[in-house]
Amino acid sequence: MRFFICGSALTGQPDNRNLGGATLLGAARTAPKYRLHSVKNGWHPGIYEVESGGISILGELYELTPQQHASLMAGEPPDMYQVTIEMDDGSHAEAMLYPRELIEKHGYPDISHFGGWAAYKASTSAVG
């Protein structure tokens, strides 16, 4: 299955090992209909779909076998859920979203202006 990764399993991030050698198809962007938040003090991103005011989120597209998918899911936080999302080229891929109501409840910061998790993490490691 085609799976969009936009967080801690990106190339160079700590959870990339959870992909179990999945085939990287390349950099990819979502359609401009999502928001990106830093969840649990920067532990992982949370994205959710919006009707307006969304951005294209930069990430990576992978081809996963059922075993690789199971390995990835085992490392995902329990609040996240898998859905089919739209990519910027009109195609679709599976991805993990985070419930908007939990983001709002906890006041997790909107980091959409960074355009992706890797840019956000690079900005936080450059500080202090």
Which residues are covered by each model-predicted region?
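Glycine-aromatic micro-motifs
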Residues: M1-G128
